[in-house]
Structures are given as structure tokens and as C-alpha cells.
Amino acid sequence: MELAVVGSSEFVTGFRLAGIKKIYEAKSDELESVVTKVLKDSDVGIFVIHEDDFNKLPEILRDTLSESVDPTVVTLGGTGESSNLREKIKQSVGVDLWK
């Protein structure tokens, strides 16, 4: 399983420097099609997207991403990101690791 990152060039640069191979730069108008493409990739286990980009997606796609376990979707960059990550880990593993 691989990590995939979708977002603006500024958002994905750090992930690219860290050696992540599945990097998808996407402008606002391309976001929905790129996210759909990543969701269909069976090699992706964790999908990272900026919270602002996540909020730009249609509600139906946001719901799909929020409920997705494979891949697990993690939003970064907004308020409350720690609790979001905690919930995603709890959802995918089945245990609250912070307790």
C-alpha cells in the first residue's frame, strides 16, 4: 500500500521531498477528477488532501471520502487536524490509540 497526496504545488512539495511517489498536483478545477482517480487506485492505502481542498469537493464526494477505510483519507492543514487524524486512525484500526 502506498501513500498518495493531492493538492496544490505548495502543499505537495514537502511530500515530494520526503520521497512520496504518488503525488498529484491539482488546481481547484481539476480537484474532483484527480480525487476520483486516486480513489480508484487500488495501490493507495492512505490518501492525504488539504482540508481547504477537501471542502471544495462536492458533498457526495466528501461523504465518500469521510467514510472511506481503504484508502484511509487524512485531511491536513485546517483547524482540528489532530482530532481528525485521531478519528481516522480509530476508524481504520478499530481502536482509539490515544487512550
UniProtKB/Swiss-Prot annotation:
GO cellular component terms given for this protein: plasma membrane
User: Which residue pairs form cystines in this protein?
Assistant: none
**UniProt keywords, alphabetically:** ATP synthesis, Cell membrane, Hydrogen ion transport, Ion transport, Membrane, Transport
Molecular function (GO) terms for this protein are: ATP binding; proton-transporting ATP synthase activity, rotational mechanism; proton-transporting ATPase activity, rotational mechanism
Q: Which InterPro entries has this protein been placed in?
A: ATPase_V1-cplx_f_g_su, ATPase_V1-cplx_fsu_bac/arc, ATPase_V1_fsu_sf
Q: Any keyword Transport?
A: yes
One Pfam family name is ATP-synt_F
Extract one GO BP annotation from the record.
Answer: proton motive force-driven plasma membrane ATP synthesis
Q: Determine the domain of life of the protein's source.
A: Archaea
Q: How does it sit in the membrane?
A: Peripheral membrane protein
Chief subcellular location: membrane
Any idea where this protein resides? Cell membrane
Give the protein's function. Answer: Component of the A-type ATP synthase that produces ATP from ADP in the presence of a proton gradient across the membrane.
Relate the assembly described in the record. Answer: Has multiple subunits with at least A(3), B(3), C, D, E, F, H, I and proteolipid K(x).
Indicate the family of this protein.
Belongs to the V-ATPase F subunit family.
Official protein name in the record: A-type ATP synthase subunit F
Identify the species of origin.
Methanococcoides burtonii (strain DSM 6242 / NBRC 107633 / OCM 468 / ACE-M)
The gene is atpF
